[in-house]
Structure formats: C-alpha cells, structure tokens
Amino acid sequence: MSPVLSESQLRDFKHTLESSKIPFRSEVRLGILSSFKIGGVCPVIVEPEISSQVSEILHIFSKFDIPWKILGGGSNLLISDHPDNFVTLRLSGKFKEFVSLGDGKFKIGAATNTTPTFRQISQLGYTGAEFLSTIPGWTGGAVIQNAGCYGGELFDLIESVEFLRNGEVFVRKPSEIKYGYRFTEFLNQKDSIILGIEILLKEGNLEEIESSLKDKRDRRNSSQPENKKSAGSVFKNPKVFREDGKEIKAWELLDQAGLRGQIKGGAQISPEHCNFIVNLGTATASDVHYLIDLVVDRVYQTSGILLNREIEFFGDIP
C-alpha cells in the first residue's frame, strides 16, 4: 500500500493548480460519484475541462511526483475505503458534450453519461446504438471496456477514438486498436486517457427505434436488482459451453454454488440476481472484496471454472 500524500506535497500541488486555473476540489468522498455508493475521501479531485488542461495536469502530476487515477461515471467500480494515497482525475467541461457531425456521425465526449446520451441520439432517428441507452456510466469507461449487451458492442459503432498518451493526443481507428469481449488495450494502458469518440449510425424508423429503446430498457430492468446500489455484473461470463452448445452464465455458477443471498457486513450477493453484489446501506469495499473472493473460491470448488471480475478496483482494497 502506498503512503498517504503529505500535507506539504498537497499544498504545493494545489497552489500550482490554482495558478494554472485548473478546476479542482478538496476532500471529496468518492462514494457519492459511484453507483455502489462505496468509497472514502480522496484528498483532491482534479476536473479538467479541455484537452490542454489534461496535458498540463499530467505534467504537474509528474513534477510533484503525485500518483493519480482517472475516475469516470463510477458505474463499474469498487472504490477503496481509503483513497488517500493518490489524486483523482475526472474529466469535465467540453468532455461532457456530444455533437452531430451530420449524416449519422456523432462526436461524443468521454465524460458524457451513456444512458441519456445514446437515448437522445437514438431519438434523433438514428439506429444501432439503442443498446447503449441501457448501460450506465460514462462513454470513456464504455470505450475502455468495449461495453455491450443484447448482441451489440460499442466498437461495432466506433469510427475513431481520441485519446491522450504521454502528453500527446492520438486519433485511432478501431482497426488500429486491440479490442474484444469486454476488453480493449486501454485496460492495460493506465497512462492513456480517453478523450472522446466518433461513431457512425444509420437512419432508422423513429417508431421502431422508440420500441427498441423501450424493449431494451424493460429487459435491463427485469435483469437487475430493483432500486439497489450496485456496480452491475460482478463477473464476466466464462465463455464455457454445455454439450448442447448453450453458454454457461456466471450467475448460474454462483447459484449452483449456493451463493445467492450471502451477506458480509453491509454487502450482499443479490437474492434476485446473483451476479450482482448490492450495498445494503453500510457496505465497505472490504465487505464486497470478501464476497468476491468467496465467489471465486466456491465456484472453482464446485465447477472447476475460474471466474474473472468484470468490475474494476479503484485504489487499495484489502
């Protein structure tokens, strides 16, 4: 575990941010920025509004030897109870915007909220992105994980990805990026920051689009714990198939292992949908981590299948 940032280190760092007119906030409880509502207080959260500020912040991080992590919509994260040994970077300003470029092409900022953004784009009469209106979080995070559901993936629609790496802005086509099921090369490149994407959609029938939006919304609502704080599906489907060719789902393995409803502290494996862990109101990151380890061990013992996490850890979680 890394040491807590010193007061003098933070003081000089914040003074430089002020001089550079880069927006930031101090002593922010990160749990309020996550769908899990779990996470402790971070000493500083920096909120750049334009690309040049992002580049400048990375230079400042290096100058003061400040460890940092980037936080998006917080929908697929388990945040540490003690995120006090790093600074959080969270895009704002122009990164929260999307614009039509005409002929079905849209430029979408990394800090746009996926659900309303792709619903609005679909309601303009363009089809192909309806499934993304059911995925919570921000577009940047959706890019990193190649988010998808109902047979669609974000990279099916992407024309280009704009990202910053080592202080330089790049624009890459999907053919120039490694990606797959719930994976892109950005997952393993912590020095890369997604800035935005361009997508291309086809014109469609608005009545059919509205019907598709409603169908996917209803399916999503029926497959998740209702009105519960969670980070979405905890485990990836293992890509293992039965003799009849049907895919074995992660939730089935949890259910067969007798894990439905298991509780640790304020966290519970959902009785309704057991590939979800829910915050009953007082859950800590350690509570959730305990249940994750329990699932991995028990499922392996009962099925011989090793499950991989879909949610990401943010900070040190014992």
Curated annotation (Swiss-Prot):
Pathway participation: Cell wall biogenesis; peptidoglycan biosynthesis
EC number(s) stated in the UniProt entry for this protein: 1.3.1.98
UniProt-annotated location(s): Cytoplasm
Residue spans of biased composition, Basic and acidic residues class: 212-229
FAD-binding PCMH-type domain sequence ranges: 38-204
One term under GO cellular component: cytosol
Catalytic residue positions: R182, S233 (proton donor), E310
GO MF annotations, alphabetized: FAD binding; UDP-N-acetylmuramate dehydrogenase activity
Cofactor(s) of this protein: FAD
Residues covered by region (Disordered): 212-232
Keywords: Cell cycle, Cell division, Cell shape, Cell wall biogenesis/degradation, Cytoplasm, FAD, Flavoprotein, NADP, Oxidoreductase, Peptidoglycan synthesis
Record GO biological process: cell division; cell wall organization; peptidoglycan biosynthetic process; regulation of cell shape
Pfam families the UniProt entry points to: FAD_binding_4, MurB_C
SUPFAM superfamilies listed in its UniProt record: FAD-binding/transporter-associated domain-like, Uridine diphospho-N-Acetylenolpyruvylglucosamine reductase, MurB, C-terminal domain
Enzymatic reactions: UDP-N-acetyl-alpha-D-muramate + NADP(+) = UDP-N-acetyl-3-O-(1-carboxyvinyl)-alpha-D-glucosamine + NADPH + H(+)
Top enzyme category: oxidoreductase
Protein purpose: Cell wall formation.
Similarity annotation: Belongs to the MurB family.
HAMAP family cross-referenced by the UniProt entry: MurB
Protein's name in the database: UDP-N-acetylenolpyruvoylglucosamine reductase
Lineage of source species: Bacteria, Pseudomonadati, Spirochaetota, Spirochaetia, Leptospirales
